[in-house]
A protein has these predicted regions:
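Catalytic donor nucleotide-activated moiety binding site of glycosyltransferases and closely related
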Residues: 1-9
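Catalytic binding pocket for nucleotide-activated donors in carbohydrate/polymer assembly enzymes
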Residues: 10-154
Length: 154
């Protein structure tokens, strides 16, 4: 059984935001939506992210000790990591705010559209010679994407 048979009652997202430190664990969940909800909240909490071989599209953009605190995959260093954060409250607060800013920039609606824009533009450059459009095709004209990207994308 989990935690040696000890199971705590479920906690709502709103209740989670009362905690100073929030641990993101790999498993059967939706980590990207959880990041967006938790990090994008008005009450900053420091994210503690498990080192893992699993990933989301935005993980390469995140930097340890800038946007989150990294914890070993077996959580062997969790106590030491929390002690470090408690001993450095200014740094912990900065990491929490950096994580929140990261969400607003990359995981917001505009941020996700920019990510898709960059993917589609790369695909377009690769497939440009093979691309054909007929009267039955439904697409967003490239000029609209470029106008959007110019104003919104990083």
């Amino acid at each position: 059984a989990a935690l040696g048979g000890m199971i705590a009652p479920a906690v709502s997202m709103r209740q989670m935001l009362r905690y100073r430190y929030l641990v993101i664990v790999d498993g059967n969940n939706a980590p990207s939506s959880r990041y967006a909800t938790l990090l994008g909240a008005t009450s900053p909490s420091v994210m503690i992210k498990q080192n893992s071989s699993f990933g989301e599209w935005f993980y390469p953009l995140m930097k340890p000790f800038v946007h989150y605190l990294p914890v070993h995959h077996d959580f062997g260093d969790l106590t030491q990591l929390i002690s470090y954060a408690r001993d450095h409250p200014e740094l912990a607060e900065e990491i929490a705010w950096n994580g929140r800013d990261f969400v607003w920039k990359y995981l917001s609606f505009d941020g996700v559209l920019c990510h898709w824009h960059s993917i589609l533009m790369r695909m377009r450059s690769i497939l440009a010679d093979d691309l054909t459009v007929n009267e039955r095709s439904h697409y967003v004209p490239l000029t609209l994407w470029k106008m959007y990207a110019k104003d919104k994308c990083w």
